[in-house]
Amino acid sequence: MKTQRDGPSLGRWSLVLLLLGLTMPLAVIARVLSYQEAVLRAVDVLNQRSSDANLYRLLNLDPRPTMDGDPDTPKPVSFTVKETVCPRTIQRSPEECDFKEDGLVKWCVGTVTLNQAKDSFDISCDKDKRKVAQLGDVLQKAGEKIVRGLKNIGQRIKDFFGKLTPRTES
């Protein structure tokens, strides 16, 4: 009686399983991170290198720019982080920490690679200057509206007095 073990199919399956076993570690090593995962890793690196007392957590991730498909090419990133209530000395994920009320907000820009094996980050952070720039824009627009409003009021006053006719005594 002939069994499955005697046939060539067992040898083929063994070869397929062997090839799969050899290629699986390569797939794990060459794992490609998503844009958000790469930024979260960058935040972890920032927390490790920071001399501030508390951890920072991702507050806002600016929209992903259009990028090429090469995970080894550095990708531009822009995001804000905010100080949390968790001390940097404890081993805790920043996502587990609440934001500190009136905590420091930093705007970060730089590049990351999506290839986890490369793990390349070039990020610099400053106090959130965009808020100051946004305030400047708001003040400029408000000033322009005030000037337009004053011009309109001036024109109305001019029109009002222009319509008045001098009174003559009879």
Curated annotation (Swiss-Prot):
Taxonomic superkingdom: Eukaryota
Propeptide feature ranges: 31-131
SUPFAM superfamilies named in the record: Cystatin/monellin
Keyword Hydrolase part of the UniProt annotation: no
Family designation: Belongs to the cathelicidin family.
Annotated function: Antimicrobial protein that is an integral component of the innate immune system. Binds to bacterial lipopolysaccharides (LPS). Acts via neutrophil N-formyl peptide receptors to enhance the release of CXCL2. Postsecretory processing generates multiple cathelicidin antimicrobial peptides with various lengths which act as a topical antimicrobial defense in sweat on skin. The unprocessed precursor form, cathelicidin antimicrobial peptide, inhibits the growth of Gram-negative E.coli and E.aerogenes with efficiencies comparable to that of the mature peptide LL-37 (in vitro).
Protein name: Cathelicidin antimicrobial peptide
Source organism: Ateles fusciceps robustus
Lineage: Eukaryota, Metazoa, Chordata, Craniata, Vertebrata
